[in-house]
Amino acid sequence: TTEKDQPDNVDEQHLVLIPDADGVAKNVFYGKEILKQNSAVVEDALRTKLGKVDWLFVLCGGGGGTGSSSFALDEAFNRYLKSVEAEGKVFYIATWPSAQELLNSTIAKNAMSLATDLKDAPHIILDNEKQMKILRGKVGILDLFPTANKAFAKLLSQTFKLASLKSSIQSFDSKDLERCMKENKRMLIGTTVIKNAQTPNLGAQILQNCIKRSPCPTTHTDSNIGALLLVINQEMASDPKISQHLDAAISYVGGRTKTLFSGVYVVDNAPGLVAIMLMGGLTE
C-alpha cells in the first residue's frame, strides 16, 4: 500500500509492507500478482509475529485493489496454519461497498471478484450500505464506519465470550462455536434486544430482527448450520411462561437451519431478552 494509506496509530511491528508495491490503483489482477509473488513474505511474517494460533481472521475491504486481491494469499494462509498444527481455519471478514461506491464500475467489479473468490470459504460480508442506514442520523459522517466496525467487533466478541461461559440452563460451548465457524460459505450474524419476552411469535420476531439489524447482507434462504444465543435476567429465568416462549423461539429458529446450536444464559443486568443469531453455510 502507499504510505498515506497506512493506518494511523498502528505500531510498526504490526505492519508488513510488501516490497515494490506502492499501491495497486484498484487493479485486482495486479494486486493478486503482487500478493502471490510475495506470499512467502506474508507467511513468514505470520509465523514470526503471531506464532501458534488455531484460527486466522483475514479482514479485507471489497472494492479496492489490495483488499479485493486478498484471497490470492489463501494458500499461504492455510500453509501457515498447517505448519503450526492449527485446529481451526482461515476465516474471512470482507466489506461490501455502499450503493454510492458501487456506482463506480471498477469498485463494483472488484467487490464482485472478491465475493466470488470467497464463496466457498468460511466468511462474513459486512454490507456498508446496510450499516450506514442503521447508523445514519445517530453519528456524524466521520464516525460512521468506525462506529459500525466497533459495533460488529463487539457483537463478535460477545459471541466468543458467551461460548466460554457456563450456563445452568443450556450452554453453547467453544466446540459448538468452532463447528459453526468451520462451515464453508457465507455466515450471517445479528443481534436484537426484546423488552417483552412474552410477546406472541417470539421466534419470528427474533429471527426477523436479527436478520434486519445484522450488518451482513439479508438472506432469504435456510442455512446449513446456525446458533441462537439468548441472554435473560433472573426475573425472566424464574417465569415459567417465558420458559415456554424461549423453547418455542429456539424451535422456530431451528426450522430455518439444518443444525442448530443454542445457549441460554442468565445475566443479572440484562436489559431484556438479548438474542444473538448465527447462520452459516449460506449460498446467497
Locate each region found by the language model:
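Tubulin/FtsZ superfamily GTPase core signature
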Residues: 1-284
